[in-house]
Amino acid sequence: MQQYLDFMRHVLEHGTEKTDRTGTGTLSVFGHQMRFDLQEGFPLVTTKRTHLKSIIHELLWFLQGSSNVAYLREHGVTIWDEWADPDGELGPVYGVQWRSWPTPDGRHIDQIAQVVEQIRRTPDSRRLIVSAWNVGEIEQMALPPCHAFFQFYVADGRLSCQLYQRSADIFLGVPFNIASYALLTLMVAQVTGLKPGEFIWTGGDCHLYTNHLEQARKQLTREPRTLPVMRLNPDVRELDGFRFEDFTLEGYDPHPGIKAPVAV
């Protein structure tokens, strides 16, 4: 994950000071891309410990199409609590848009089921897209989608995925997002009978919060270690069939965690 460290160093050296919605302040650059070959290991940052349990449960929660944090809380995952109302509701966030995008005539579109079927039937399609950025419902969301749009691509029997992330919290959020979408790519590849290809991360406003700068500098003093391997239960053949116990991470030997506050 040297390219992640290089990205962080680039923002520290060349970022522009900007204000932001949270009032924290950032160093920011506009536009960046990283590519990860999923045959070379699972792209989980090794220069600090990353909480895989939260990553897996959040992705499964997205795939459930839920707008409530009850499932996350049930499994000890609190990453969405800051934005939930007293009843645990978040409005029509990621999972709702992925699994139940509303149409003007009152129907709902399951984008995930649709894209999996498209990959199986028409793998050369240029429309293998899922979007969480529903302009008509942004105001109802507790937090508008940061990772807003992703596209699959099939070539030579391999499935690749590219994510566009409009707003990228480089220190806390981006390692999480890379691992989440890399995992989704592995899952979709398995259920469509393909091998994993690349995960491509593309960012818009890429920023380090000013209260993360010292932590970022500390992380840059550490040497990346060998990437781990993610094993999926080969018996799972449908995306909705995955459960937490179907994922096994092997060979993860990270440096210790580095704490940093979340900007809300």
Swiss-Prot record:
Catalytically driven reaction(s): dUMP + (6R)-5,10-methylene-5,6,7,8-tetrahydrofolate = 7,8-dihydrofolate + dTMP
Active site: 146 (nucleophile)
Function noted in UniProt: Catalyzes the reductive methylation of 2'-deoxyuridine-5'-monophosphate (dUMP) to 2'-deoxythymidine-5'-monophosphate (dTMP) while utilizing 5,10-methylenetetrahydrofolate (mTHF) as the methyl donor and reductant in the reaction, yielding dihydrofolate (DHF) as a by-product. This enzymatic reaction provides an intracellular de novo source of dTMP, an essential precursor for DNA biosynthesis.
Membrane-crossing segments per the record: none
GO CC terms in record: cytosol
Family per similarity comment: Belongs to the thymidylate synthase family. Bacterial-type ThyA subfamily.
Naturally occurring in which organism (per UniProt): Deinococcus deserti (strain DSM 17065 / CIP 109153 / LMG 22923 / VCD115)
Assembly with partners or alone: Homodimer.
Cystine residue pairs: none
Entries under SUPFAM superfamilies matching the protein: Thymidylate synthase/dCMP hydroxymethylase
Keywords: Cytoplasm, Methyltransferase, Nucleotide biosynthesis, Transferase
Gene name of the encoded protein: thyA
Protein name: Thymidylate synthase
Subcellular location: Cytoplasm
NCBIfam families: PRK01827.1-3 (NF002497), PRK01827.1-5 (NF002499), thym_sym (TIGR03284)
Annotated positions binding dUMP: 21, 126-127, 166-169, 177, 207-209
PANTHER family to which the protein is assigned, alphabetical: THYMIDYLATE SYNTHASE, THYMIDYLATE SYNTHASE 1
GO MF, one annotated term: thymidylate synthase activity
Residues engaged in binding (6R)-5,10-methylene-5,6,7,8-tetrahydrofolate: 51, 169, 263
EC number(s) on file: 2.1.1.45
This protein's pathway: Pyrimidine metabolism; dTTP biosynthesis
GO biological process: dTMP biosynthetic process; dTTP biosynthetic process; methylation
PROSITE patterns: THYMIDYLATE_SYNTHASE (PS00091)
